[in-house]
Swiss-Prot record:
Keywords: ATP-binding, Kinase, Nucleotide-binding, Phosphoprotein, Serine/threonine-protein kinase, Transferase. This is Mitogen-activated protein kinase mpkC. The modification Phosphotyrosine is found at Y173. A motif (TXY) lies at residues 171-173. SUPFAM superfamilies: Protein kinase-like (PK-like). Its EC number is 2.7.11.24.
Length: 377
């Protein structure tokens, strides 16, 4: 039986096995506390996330179960990798994942990115999204702070707590406002994997211009900012809106023509703007997919169709429609943890194929210098 150490970190009881040493707080949110720590078995640093009160309600327990199942299933080098799961004596859930040095949000808050970093980062984001979407999963909360990066330019998407099955009817609580797709604001219940592509487009625009493209103060202001740049929603979009009040709101907007994105982003190549135009399309049915975006000429230096894997099959979402009491979810979570511990940690995703035409070494050196200058390492 594992031995536990108890500490108090940021006023929170933090229990961890003796496998880990030197926990240091790196993040705190409504769903948990995250600490860096050193794994004495793998001799690698990890991020230890304590999920706060996972069994307080059936909805929290279900969210925890969903996140654990997704982390166990999704295995790709541009997604955060699960290292360990354990349940503490106080019955809190702890998830250990690989630790990367910083996140994109932090980098963007310090100084603008060089265009070559923006190009490589959006390639990796889309590469990860292709895999996620092929598993029939929507991330739903893609934003710079959920994009982790290390000094070698390796990028990994994290935080699958809000991820969902792609299906016709969806709940409306998703995504930080700046990166929220218009179809979510217009209908709230009908959307697909295209919402992640919109979020990725907003992230690309922010990397290129050095500040958010649509920094809305509220839901209505957010939509005004979008239409101010992209013009009014086409009739095909309005026809799909299910709320009469929303239809009336959209029709009440002043007439606006799309602006030239190059005048909004400024000083960047037309090829980057062309990809952005295809990602930031109000109608999700005509928005480019992650897979097609990888083939865009802007990403030609990195694109390798033999090294952009899809999932082995769709994720099993059969549990997601269940409305179990929290005690049942608790048993299911315990079962998943025991299964993980008994089966063991699957092999990490393979690194980039060295036969790819892209040699990242020079870019890695430049990015390491960028991080050093920014005080991130």
């Amino acid at each position: 039986m594992a031995e536990f150490v108890r500490a108090e970190i940021l006023g929170t009881k933090f229990e961890y096995t003796t496998r880990y040493v030197n926990p240091q707080p790196i993040g705190m949110g409504s769903f948990g506390l995250v600490c860096s720590a050193f794994d004495q078995i793998t001799q690698q640093p990890v991020a230890l996330k304590k999920i706060m009160k996972p069994f307080d309600s059936s909805s929290l327990a279900k969210r925890t179960y969903r996140e654990i199942r997704l982390l166990k299933y999704l295995r790709h080098e541009n997604l955060i990798c699960l290292r360990d799961i354990f349940i503490s004596p106080l019955e809190d859930i702890y998830i250990a994942t690989e630790l990367l040095g910083t996140d994109l949000g932090r980098l963007l808050s310090i100084k603008p990115l060089d265009s070559k970093f923006s190009q490589y980062f959006i390639y990796q984001i889309l590469r990860g999204l292709k895999y996620i979407h092929s598993a029939n999963v929507i991330h739903r909360d893609l934003k710079p702070t959920n994009i982790l990066i290390n000094e070698n330019c390796d990028l990994k998407i994290c935080d699958f707590g809000l991820a969902r099955l792609q299906e016709p009817q969806m709940t409306g609580y998703v995504a930080t406002r700046y990166y929220r797709a218009p179809e979510i604001m217009l209908t709230w219940q009908r959307y697909g994997v295209q919402v992640d592509v919109w979020s990725a487009g907003c992230i690309l625009a922010e990397m290129l211009r050095g500040k958010p493209l649509f920094p809305g103060k509220d839901h209505v202001h957010q939509f005004h900012l979008i239409t101010n740049v992209l013009g009014n929603p086409p009739d095909a979009v309005i026809e799909k809106i299910t709320s009469k009040n929303t239809v009336n709101f959209v029709k009440s907007l002043p007439s606006r023509e799309p602006r030239d994105l190059s005048t909004v982003i400024m000083t960047h190549t037309s090829i980057a703007i062309d990809l952005l135009k295809k990602m930031l399309v109000i109608d999700p049915d005509t928005r480019i997919s992650a897979q097609d975006a990888l083939r865009h000429p802007y990403l030609a230096p990195y694109h390798d169709p033999t090294d952009e894997p899809a999932a082995s099959g769709p994720f099993d979402w059969s549990f997601d429609s269940a409305d179990f009491p929290k005690e049942t979810w608790k048993i299911m979570i315990y079962s998943e943890v025991l299964d993980y511990l008994n089966v063991g940690n699957p092999a990490d995703p393979a690194p980039f194929d060295p036969s790819t035409p892209f040699d990242p070494s020079a870019l890695e050196r430049e990015f390491s210098e960028f991080l050093s200058d920014s005080g991130q390492i």
